Curated annotation (Swiss-Prot):
GO-annotated cellular components: chloroplast; cytosol; plastid
Cofactor: Mg(2+)
Family matches, as Pfam families: Dabb (PF07876)
Name of the protein described by the UniProt record: Stress-response A/B barrel domain-containing protein At5g22580
Lineage of origin: Eukaryota, Viridiplantae, Streptophyta, Embryophyta, Tracheophyta
InterPro entries according to UniProt: Dabb, Dimeric_a/b-barrel, HS1/DABB1-like
Domain Stress-response A/B barrel as annotated: residue spans: 6-98
Recorded superkingdom: Eukaryota
Summary of the function given for this chain in its UniProt record: Involved in stress response.
Molecular functions per Gene Ontology: metal ion binding
Quaternary data: Homodimer.
Binding site for Mg(2+): 31, 34-35, 37
Length: 111
């Protein structure tokens, strides 16, 4: 099966008093400055039952052209600096990094 890029998926539960808006702005700023990030999406869970959510509230997804692009991102000085601040406000986290097996192309939002 052919792959279509490399994905970095992060699901988090922030600590109680975290200023999530500041973290989101920092993350958006970070990905805009590192060229190897080809796409970035994030969302806050609004629909899952608490029992199923297990406390996790936010998901972040980045796509890279390949694993080398991801490795360049993780070692970039801006990412290293941001990671320290991000880690400090995390209560729980799940990370998945994998080659993408694209079955259907992206959904285009309608106005």
């Amino acid at each position: 099966m052919a792959t279509s890029g490399f994905k970095h998926l992060v699901v988090v539960k922030f600590k109680e008093d975290t200023k999530v808006d500041e973290i989101l702005k920092g993350l958006e700023n970070l990905v805009s400055q590192i060229d190897t990030v080809k796409s970035f999406e994030w969302g806050e869970d609004k629909e899952s039952h608490d029992m199923l959510r297990q406390g996790f509230t936010h998901a972040f997804s980045m796509t890279f052209e390949n694993k080398d692009g991801y490795v360049a991102f993780t070692s970039h000085p801006l990412h290293v600096e941001f990671s320290a601040a991000f880690t400090a406000v995390i209560d729980k986290i799940v990370l998945l990094d994998f080659p993408v097996a694209a079955v259907k192309s992206s959904v285009v939002a309608t106005p």
